[in-house]
Every structure is written in structure tokens, then in C-alpha cells.
Swiss-Prot record:
Top EC class for this record: oxidoreductase
Domain of life: Bacteria
Gene: ispH
Residues that coordinate or bind (2E)-4-hydroxy-3-methylbut-2-enyl diphosphate: 50, 83, 133, 173, 231-233, 276
Binding-site list for dimethylallyl diphosphate: 50, 83, 133, 231-233, 276
Protein name listed in UniProt: 4-hydroxy-3-methylbut-2-enyl diphosphate reductase
Pathway: Isoprenoid biosynthesis; dimethylallyl diphosphate biosynthesis; dimethylallyl diphosphate from (2E)-4-hydroxy-3-methylbutenyl diphosphate: step 1/1; Isoprenoid biosynthesis; isopentenyl diphosphate biosynthesis via DXP pathway; isopentenyl diphosphate from 1-deoxy-D-xylulose 5-phosphate: step 6/6
Family: Belongs to the IspH family.
GO BP, one annotated term: dimethylallyl diphosphate biosynthetic process
Length: 338
């Protein structure tokens, strides 16, 4: 075990901003409000956000997370996660007589609308993102015949388009800014007339958290990122920290996952968290470090954030009654249309 004292000059650099973004905050509150208004169970298609603690907490309150719409009983309420879903999922829910709440992050919805717009104009769309990620699946589903996935610079060589003068790039919102631009540069070299999206697709929170980590990584020997392994933006923070100069960087869900061996020879620890991580988990990491002599905490502030999103409009309706009416229509027990 590493021997430490409070006077050893050890310090913590705490990133700001960190943790919940506006889209995650909106989605989590939406589940809590739905449970409060309609009672359990509330079904959620896929994890509402990619964080183990958040999902487990909501499960205890009565949320049931499913991977397929077919797993939701007829007449139930189902919420779509912050990552967004393809149009076919909305169609499945309608066929299943489900009342739906769409908690898709508005910034993801923006990318969906861009995909539809460019598809309607018959562009080839090069979607920069990670294969299999829920957000990529949802966006691709908006225009599957027009979208080609580009999973990093290594994919560029094999990309083919119908007309090099009608090609546009879009991106997953949670990517590394630097890697995305590296991919874009490679695409522009191959397709000089490549069009950029009308506004930046990588979300403000992803960019701000990466900027703070870059500043931190210049001074930190070790960076601890609080986040789950299936969280794209959290994984990217580990990568950014290493590229910024940190000797080591690790991803943990909880403080008890930290290995004391990581602290050998370390005087400065950087701490941040992904956009789907509640602050309580960061506080537990800070307490863990404090108990081992890292009591001096300095804030590394990269940006101010004040963005908020309104809750899904469906939470202003009586969804239980709507779901029951849908089932009655199917069984023929509902009121006559005559």
C-alpha cells in the first residue's frame, strides 16, 4: 500500500465542467417524472443513459430497461433513451399499442433532422461514429439507403459515393473532437467537395469536458475518469487525457474500483466524469483520494454551461389513458366511432 500524508504536496485537479449534460439531466428527470405521474412500471428502450449507477437507481424505483420494443407488454408506456431511435422503432411501438415518451437528446434529434434533410436532397451522407453505438443505429435508421458509417480515419480508404459533388458528413455527438476532425480531413482529401453540417454535431458538453481534460492532462500524472465502459464520451475522455500528456488515465464506475497501485509516484491526480455521471460518484472518488493524502483540490475550469432542455411533451398528457384506449381499439371494446 502507498504511504501518504496530507503534507506530501499531493493534489487533485478537478475538471469543470464535468458530469451531467443537459440532455442526460432531461432524460433522467423524464424517467423519474413518468414514474411519479403514471406509476411503475415504466419501460425504457435501452439504458436511458450509459451509466450503471443511474440505471440501477431507476430500476429500484420501478423502471424496466429492455433492448427490444417487442419486450414491452401491449398497452404499456415505453420511453426512448437519450441516444435516439430509428423511425422503425416508433412504428413498432405504434403496432404494439404502446404509449411512448421520447427522451432523445435534442442535440441528437438535430443530427436526425440533418440526415433526413440531406437524404431528401439525395446526398450521400458519411456518418462518422462507432459501429453498434445506439446513437449511430438511430441516426442511420433515418436514411439507411443514403448513410455510410465511417468509424474513424482507417475507414476512409474504403468509402465510396455515387457523386463526389453531393456528399456531406455528419457525426455521432459524443466523439473525440480531435479524432473526428482527423477523419474529416481524410475525407476532404478524398472528396474535396465534401460538405460540412450546418452546425457542429459534436455536442457542447462533449467538447467542454474534453477541453477541461486537455488542460488537466498537461499537469496530471494520473487522470481518473468516472464513467461506465459503454459510455462513448467517458471512454473518449480517457483517450484525450493520455494524448494531453497524462502518464496514466483510467475509467471507473465507482471509487472502490480505483487501484492504489495507480498512485505510486503520483503527486497530481486529475478527476473528471462523463456526461451521464451524477456528481455523487465524483464526490466518492474525491473522498477516496482525500483519505490517501490527496486533500488539496484545485478546479480546472474550461467553460461555463447554462444550457437546459424542457422535458418531453408527452409528460404533459395522460399516457395511461391513451395506452388503454389504444388497446380497446384493437380489441373492439372501445367506444363506437359512429
Amino acid at each position: 500500500m502507498v504511504s501518504m500524508t496530507a503534507s506530501s504536496g499531493r493534489r487533485v485537479l478537478l475538471a469543470a465542467p464535468r458530469g451531467y449534460c443537459a440532455g442526460v439531466d432531461r432524460a433522467v428527470i423524464a424517467v423519474e417524472k413518468a414514474l411519479e405521474q403514471y406509476g411503475a412500471p415504466i419501460y425504457v428502450r435501452h439504458e436511458i443513459v450509459h451509466n450503471k449507477y443511474v440505471v440501477q437507481t431507476l430500476e429500484r424505483k420501478g423502471a424496466i430497461f429492455v433492448e427490444r420494443t417487442a419486450e414491452v407488454p401491449e398497452g404499456a408506456i415505453v420511453m426512448f433513451s437519450a441516444h435516439g431511435v430509428a423511425p422503425v422503432v416508433h412504428e413498432e411501438a405504434a403496432r404494439g399499442k404502446l404509449a411512448t415518451i421520447d427522451a432523445t437528446c435534442p442535440l441528437v434529434t438535430k443530427v436526425h433532422k440533418e440526415a433526413v434533410r440531406f437524404a431528401n436532397e439525395d446526398f450521400d451522407i458519411l456518418l462518422i461514429g462507432h459501429e453498434g453505438h445506439e446513437e449511430v443505429i438511430g441516426t442511420s435508421g433515418e436514411a439507411p439507403e443514403h448513410i455510410t458509417l465511417v468509424d474513424g480515419p482507417g475507414d476512409v480508404a474504403k468509402v465510396e459515393v455515387r457523386d463526389p459533388s453531393k456528399v456531406v458528413w455528419l457525426s455521432q455527438t459524443t466523439l473525440s473532437v480531435d479524432e473526428t476532425m482527423e477523419t474529416v480531413d481524410a475525407l476532404k482529401e478524398k472528396f474535396p467537395q465534401l460538405i460540412s453540417p450546418p452546425s457542429d454535431d459534436i455536442c457542447y458538453a462533449t467538447q467542454n469536458r474534453q477541453l477541461a481534460v486537455k488542460q488537466m492532462g498537461e499537469e496530471a500524472d494520473l487522470v481518473i475518469v468516472v464513467g461506465s465502459r459503454n459510455s462513448s464520451n467517458s471512454v473518449r475522455l480517457v483517450e484525450v487525457a493520455k494524448l494531453a500528456g497524462a502518464r496514466d488515465a483510467y475509467l471507473v464506475d465507482f471509487a472502490d474500483e480505483i487501484d492504489e497501485a495507480w498512485l505510486e509516484g503520483v503527486s497530481t491526480v486529475g478527476v473528471t466524469s462523463g456526461a451521464s455521471v451524477p456528481e455523487i460518484l465524483v464526490e466518492q472518488v474525491l473522498e477516496w483520494l482525500s483519505q490517501r493524502g490527496f486533500e488539496d483540490v484545485e478546479i480546472v475550469k474550461a467553460a461555463e454551461e447554462s444550457i437546459t432542455f424542457s422535458l418531453p411533451k408527452e409528460l404533459r398528457r395522460d399516457l395511461r389513458a391513451e395506452a388503454a384506449a389504444l388497446v380497446e381499439q384493437r380489441t373492439g371494446n372501445g367506444p363506437s366511432a359512429e
